[in-house]
Curated annotation (Swiss-Prot):
TM region positions: 4-23, 38-57, 64-81, 117-139
Bilayer disposition of the protein: Multi-pass membrane protein
Swiss-Prot/TrEMBL keywords: Cell membrane, Chaperone, Disulfide bond, Electron transport, Membrane, Oxidoreductase, Redox-active center, Transmembrane, Transmembrane helix, Transport
One Pfam family linked to the record: DsbB
Protein name: Probable disulfide formation protein
GO terms, biological process: protein folding
Example of a GO cellular component annotation carried by this entry: plasma membrane
Length: 153
């Protein structure tokens, strides 16, 4: 997979995550919690920045988007650990019960469906940030030219 393809894929992941986030809050009327807002702060610019970089072929954009994706992943991991009961809820997450950070928001159906207990919105966010990091951190493959071809050319 070449760098252009990885850049486009990272943009598509960020775009899907942004549109999905807007769908859940604006169409399904889920109230974003403080940790969700933090993840939005890091994901939404990625959709714009990666889109522009993909269309103009700017591979130097990695130095700007990798820190955003890493910070977003940190918030997503923390929220998942909180939802799974591994860490205690932070004070900002307990103020508004309508937007509690440890609420397992269902992706489809109800929160009682088996898949929805595992595949929640915070899990999707964590996957999206991890995919963006993986796609943009993939080492560049160097093309080596054999000496015999270099001498003839």
């Amino acid at each position: 997979m070449n760098r252009d393809t990885r850049l486009y894929l990272a943009w598509l992941v960020a775009l899907a995550a942004t549109l999905g986030s807007l769908y859940f809050s604006e169409i399904r009327h889920f109230n974003p919690c403080p940790l969700c807002w933090a993840q939005r702060i890091f994901m939404y610019p990625l959709a714009v920045i990666l889109g522009i970089a993909a269309f103009v072929g700017d591979h130097g954009v990695r130095r700007y988007v990798l820190p955003l994706a890493a910070l977003g992943l940190g918030f997503a991991i923390f929220q998942n650990l909180e939802t799974w009961g591994f860490v205690q809820s932070i004070k900002a997450c307990t103020v508004n019960a309508a937007a509690a950070c440890n609420t397992p928001w269902p992706v489809w159906g109800t929160s009682q469906d088996t898949l929805n207990r595992a595949l929640t919105i915070p899990v999707l966010s964590m996957i999206a940030f991890a995919l963006i990091l993986a796609l943009l951190s993939w080492p560049r493959q160097r093309v080596t030219v054999p000496e015999s071809a270099a001498v003839q050319g």
